[in-house]
Amino acid sequence: MLPLCLTFLSFFLSLGGSFKAVMTKEEADGTTEAAACLFWIFNWTVTLIPLNSLVALAISSPTFFGDRPKGPIFGAKAAEAPTSPPTALRYKYLTSLGSNFGGIFVYPLFLLSTF
């Protein structure tokens, strides 16, 4: 059995891999960052979501129903390239009170439970 100091150091060396394996990542929806500090775990999630568009307002316009507008038209003279819909960033901050020392204390507790 390794001394406690070597177990402690090996846990911190593998912290990046083991902590990321425990976390659930939503790669398609956004970016998740996490940091652990003693008994606190911080998670930051940034998600790019589409805004509610003004389609209902455009459909109810007189031009949509076939009326000819009166007066000058201030629209574009040439066809524009299609663009992506308007989006907004949604931030979610989660702070959890817990221990990130699970890798250290699991093995000694397992030995105690076998006796």
From Swiss-Prot:
The membrane-spanning stretches of this chain are: 39-59, 93-113
Q: Its principal location?
A: membrane
* Signal sequence, renumbered to the chain: 1-24
Membrane topology term reads:
Multi-pass membrane protein
List locations, semicolon-separated. Membrane
Its Gene Ontology cellular component terms are:
membrane
- Tell me which UniProt keywords the record has, alphabetically: Membrane, Signal, Transmembrane, Transmembrane helix
Other facts: Partially overlaps RPL12A.
Q: What is this protein called?
A: Putative uncharacterized membrane protein YEL053W-A
